[in-house]
């Protein structure tokens, strides 16, 4: 049986590695984060809304962010609710589109229906290569929406359609999602 110290070694290593990725993200992404904030402020000041899309864990992050925008991030800083829609939540819409048009269009068709010029699409993809995310970002941009991509590494194919890309400097999807 391993000693308690042996069990702690991988835990410490993982947590220190995660902290290193967060520090590297702060150094590499601060300017792009500020640009994304500027897009969001302009969107909300113009009466727009934020749409969010992603798959798997990224879908969960979309839902969490939408909830925080509609509700409030901190009670210490009161503000009105902000319009935000996670395109990952309506199972009837998702399955109808997937069945009739293919999974690659589950976000694109929702952006086509809901997105308006001045809105912002936040797309989350650890690789930037998810076909349904790429199509959504391309559609949003074609419709006059601004686009923010949260991704890792090189940013993948979605990068070509993003107004702002926040690229976590890590290749491991778990570390990208944590940052």
Predicted region positions:
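Surface-exposed amphipathic alpha-helices with a cationic face
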Residues: 137-143
């Amino acid at each position: 049986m391993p000693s308690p110290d042996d069990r702690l070694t991988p835990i410490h290593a993982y947590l220190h590695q995660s902290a290193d990725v967060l520090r590297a993200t702060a150094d590499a992404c601060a300017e792009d984060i500020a640009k994304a904030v500027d897009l969001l402020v302009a969107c909300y000041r113009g009466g727009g809304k934020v749409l969010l899309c992603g798959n798997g864990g990224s879908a969960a992050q979309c839902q969490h962010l939408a909830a925080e925008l509609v509700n409030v991030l901190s009670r210490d800083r009161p503000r009105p609710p902000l319009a935000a829609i996670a395109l990952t939540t309506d199972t009837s819409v998702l399955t109808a589109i997937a069945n009739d048009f293919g999974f690659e269009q589950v976000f694109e068709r929702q952006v086509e229906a809901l997105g308006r010029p001045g809105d912002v699409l936040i797309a989350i993809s650890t690789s930037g290569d998810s076909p349904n995310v790429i199509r959504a970002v391309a559609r949003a941009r074609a419709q006059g929406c601004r686009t923010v991509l949260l991704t890792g590494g090189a940013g993948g194919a979605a990068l070509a359609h993003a107004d702002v890309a926040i690229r976590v400097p890590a290749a491991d999807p778990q570390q990208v999602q944590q940052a």
